[in-house]
Amino acid sequence: MLVWREESTMTGQQPIRFGTDGIRGRAGELLTPNLALSLGYWVGEVLRQTTDAPQRPFIIGQDSRNSSDMLATALAAGLTAAGFEVWHVGLCPTPCIAYLTATTEAIGGAMISASHNPPADNGIKIFGSDGSKLCPDLQKEIEAHLNAGRSLPYREDWGHLHHRPELVQRYRHAVQAPLQDRQPLRGLRVVLDLAWGSAVAVTPTVFHALGAEVIALHDRADGNRINVNCGSTYLEPLQQAVREARAAMGFAFDGDADRVLAVDSQGRVVDGDHILYFWGQQLQSQAQLPKDLIVATVMSNLGFERAWQARGGQLVRAAVGDQYVHAEMLRHGAMLGGEQSGHILCRHYGVGGDGLLTAVHLATLVQDSGLSLAQLRDQSFTPYPQILRNVRVEDRQRRLRWQECEPLQRMIAKAQLDMGDRGRVLVRASGTEPVIRVMVEAEQQNIADYWTETLVQTVSAHLAA
């Protein structure tokens, strides 16, 4: 048999591994065309084994990064080489791909994006046919093929690439149609920070259709500037614009628009914890929140947890990552979950975080309440002072084995003993960046400041050196 020989993806590299949000890294270094092509082929071969209808299409979308065209095309080449029909929808939010895979009988989907990361990074997220991220067992099977460096077999039943940008409008319609007749945002002035990324594709259109007066920032696709000093990780431009425009609220999206943060009319941050609190209150009042339970993460603020418990609610903490939140939601039968960073999951709407849907729901909730977002924020909870610092650790093995660092473990124990139940420490390796994240939360700002600096110095001295 003729074979198409492919360079091993392991040549000169660490083994390829799925992280908390797919495969992510520097485009052209970790994420090469060869890797994307091989990944496409082996994703196809593995997914083929999971269905009795292997001719179902595979859907690919992308954000605005300069490397996204290259990676999307290479991934599509691998999938067509494996015999699949590929529908490339172009620029879209990640939740658009999740929605389309779940509603078009696709065998799977992929989003080319590195979410909130800088423009030079990129990533590939793989979705199963139900719109959820690929399960760990299938990820491991794909990893094994990639890291074996096998040649890609020649097939005679090639697939074809189809450009289907019109499918993005199906997603847009699904978000706006249930509310469009009611026009719930009529008269609402809102600022949208689209981060030069995927949110550009549909977000302003949906807000306009629901009656809002829209002021858009960073509102075209720009691969050089995606997430640069804008979006959900850099709120200053949004805060300033909301105050200057005297807007009721503002929303900032990340590069692939699967998460969102808000600011109120005073420019104060309304993060994922606040959104969960408001949404949880609403579902609780409608008797639609089983066991009054919300799934959050280890990053969620103690102030939120204690305020929710004071309402008679339960809060379960998952590991960081929306797939872990989703798993805990399924385990506990929860309707609502999310992350402080703005990934919000409500099982009324699907299985993944959706920045646009979350923003529309929050804006509608505020309008229906008769109060302003600022008033709702004031009535919610007082967050504990919380500090999050990232320490760059280039050595991957040191990052993954940070728990074996005895000086750091001793310092963590000392900090926790000092704060008792009035604070907490969280140290973890990022699943998306080469950093160790250090978070300290305490009732008093000076205590949080002290232990954060002490722990950052310890990580720097023993892991980053």
Swiss-Prot record:
Protein EC: 5.4.2.10
Reported cofactor(s): Mg(2+)
Organism: Thermosynechococcus vestitus (strain NIES-2133 / IAM M-273 / BP-1)
Protein name: Phosphoglucosamine mutase
Keywords: Isomerase, Magnesium, Metal-binding, Phosphoprotein
Record-linked InterPro entries: A-D-PHexomutase_a/b/a-I, A-D-PHexomutase_a/b/a-I/II/III, A-D-PHexomutase_a/b/a-II, A-D-PHexomutase_a/b/a-III, A-D-PHexomutase_C, A-D-PHexomutase_C_sf, Alpha-D-phosphohexomutase_SF, GlmM_bact
Keyword Metal-binding found: yes
GO biological process, one term: peptidoglycan biosynthetic process
Catalysis: reaction(s): alpha-D-glucosamine 1-phosphate = D-glucosamine 6-phosphate
GO molecular function, a single term: phosphomannomutase activity
Cofactor note: Binds 1 Mg(2+) ion per subunit.
UniProt PTM comment: Activated by phosphorylation.
Family in the record: Belongs to the phosphohexose mutase family.
CC annotations in GO: cytosol
Residue numbers carrying Phosphoserine: S115
Active site annotation, chain numbering: S115 (phosphoserine intermediate)
NCBIfam families: glmM (TIGR01455)
Annotated residues for binding of Mg(2+): S115, D254, D256, D258
Record function comment: Catalyzes the conversion of glucosamine-6-phosphate to glucosamine-1-phosphate.
